[in-house]
Amino acid sequence: MSHTILLVQPTKRPEGRTYADYESVNECMEGVCKMYEEHLKRMNPNSPSITYDISQLFDFIDDLADLSCLVYRADTQTYQPYNKDWIKEKIYVLLRRQAQQAGK
């Protein structure tokens, strides 16, 4: 498990920047999914349930002004930066694994 910091800038306005920290990369990726789900709930307040596919999630990520991760590396005792493409790849792997486990 590597401590992970998620940096989020929803719009071009720098005062909207925020961050969240997680105990692992997977927890962070789940946090990104939850952030999108909260966005969907705000956009559809009267909907009893929220459903989406991965392409919609990726479009949401692409529409953010900035989204990046800093992942702690114990070997160098530094944080390694990662961009949106890396985040989308990790989310894809996480969701595919969850779908496979649900199908068992």
Curated annotation (Swiss-Prot):
UniProt keyword Hydrolase present: no
Gene3D superfamilies found in the cross-reference section = Enhancer of rudimentary
| Localization of this protein | Nucleus
Q: Name one GO molecular function term.
A: RNA binding
Major place of residence? nucleus
Tissues showing expression? Expressed in all tissues examined.
- Which positions are tagged coiled coil? none
Instruction: Give all N-acetylserine modified positions.
Output: 2
Query: GO cellular-component terms in the record?
Result: methylosome; midbody; nucleus
Q: Which domain of life is it from?
A: Eukaryota
**Crosslink Glycyl lysine isopeptide (Lys-Gly) (interchain with G-Cter in SUMO2) sits at which residues?**
12
Kindly state which keywords UniProt assigns to this record, in alphabetical order: Acetylation, Cell cycle, Isopeptide bond, Nucleus, Phosphoprotein, Ubl conjugation
Listed Pfam families: ER
- InterPro entries membership: EHR_sf, ERH
Q: Which residues carry this modification: Phosphothreonine?
A: 11
For the biological process aspect of GO, one term held by this record is: pyrimidine nucleoside metabolic process
How does it associate, per the subunit comment?
Answer: Homodimer. Interacts with POLDIP3. Component of the methylosome, a 20S complex containing at least CLNS1A/pICln, PRMT5/SKB1, WDR77/MEP50, PRMT1 and ERH. Interacts with CHTOP.
Main role? May have a role in the cell cycle.
Q: Which family does it belong to?
A: Belongs to the E(R) family.
Q: What is this protein called?
A: Enhancer of rudimentary homolog
The lineage, from the top, is:
Eukaryota, Metazoa, Chordata, Craniata, Vertebrata
Whichever gene encodes this chain, its name is ERH
